[in-house]
Amino acid sequence: MNTSPVYFTDFRCHPGLNQQQKLRKLLLKAGMDKIDFQDKFVAIKMHFGELGNLAYLRPNYAKTVADLVKELGGRPFLTDCNTLYVGSRKHALEHIDTAYTNGFSPFSTGCHVIIADGLKGTDEVEVPVEGAQYCPTAKIGRALMDADSVISLTHFKGHESTGFGGAL
């Protein structure tokens, strides 16, 4: 398997170089400015957290990515799919309310929130999974499939049910 470069930064801030500026620098170092985003719909895939939860990437990081995409001519939007479990992201209306409550609004991030698999989580496209032995297909939210590009803005975390999450 081929490996990809992995870029890291620390959380220390210095005068004139805050976290958002560091993220922008990382994105440029990774070659984001070499991607053709001109007039393309760009999904920024992330999760907006549950109500009362703080274990998600802050909206200002999403804004940094969205601003760079717009600078490069793209049309960014934030997206995620509804959850299978009962919570504040089980259907699109509560999911969007949760996103806004947790700070992910068009006013704070500079782009819209679109729930990728629609109102009830049934707006999906079945796609083949190459080389899969047990799950030959996967259902993907239609908005993700309709996007011209997808940027995955994720974090890694321990999860009660699976041992890890947030990086899927």
Which sequence ranges carry the predicted segments?
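N-terminal and secondary-structure boundary signal
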Residues: 1-168
